[in-house]
Amino acid sequence: MQISQRLTAAALLILGLSTPALSQPIVPPPADVVSLSGPRVGFTVLSQSIVDTLKKDNQITVAPLISQFGWQFEKQFYSTQTGPTAVTECVLLLGGLDQGVAIPSLSWLVGVRTREGAEFGVGPNITPTGVALALAAGITFRAGTMNVPVNFAVVPSKSGTRVSVLTGFSLRRR
């Protein structure tokens, strides 16, 4: 009887001492970060009020359709292999090169991408016509380690609205 009481007391003591360790949450592994930076090319349609503002305030004369060339710096953060992932990207563009002008644009977008490649993002945009909020959506097609994004963006501002379509490529690397 004494042995069973001692075993019971020892078991209760061990269980009591280990309870704090057992109640600790399981820490998930750190998120994988993948760089998906690469060149971008496309076009932007400018509202007439944007064209007028560029001419009046910046002495830049362009047609309402301008080319876009640039680079997208992108990081994708994996949270799970089966669910959506968080994405942050910085897009630097020069517009109007086809018309002999260089109109800079900088956007920083924060968004989400599904496992199938659909993506949505929002963030600030800065151009010579002012600061605005960019809304973007698109899809990324994958071929091995190469990604080919096709994105559509709308930037409404006090000066007017800009609508862009961009594509490019990136290679998946950690």
Task: Report the location of each language-model feature.
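Cleavable N-terminal export/targeting peptides
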Residues: 1-31, 174
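Short glycine/proline- and aromatic-enriched beta-strand/turn motifs that initiate or cap beta-hairpins
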Residues: 23-70, 170-172
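Short loop/turn motifs that connect adjacent beta-strands in outer-membrane beta-barrel proteins
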Residues: 24-35, 78-86, 117, 142-148, ...
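Residues that define the transmembrane beta-barrel architecture of outer-membrane proteins
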Residues: 63-69, 102-106, 127-133, 146, ...
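Membrane-embedded beta-strands of outer-membrane beta-barrel proteins
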Residues: 71-73, 108-110, 135-137, 165-167
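Residue-level signature of outer-membrane beta-barrel architecture
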Residues: 75-77, 112, 139-141, 154-156, ...
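Transmembrane beta-strand segments that form the barrel wall of outer-membrane beta-barrel proteins
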Residues: 86-96, 117-128, 146-156
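Outer-membrane beta-barrel "beta-signal"
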Residues: 159-174
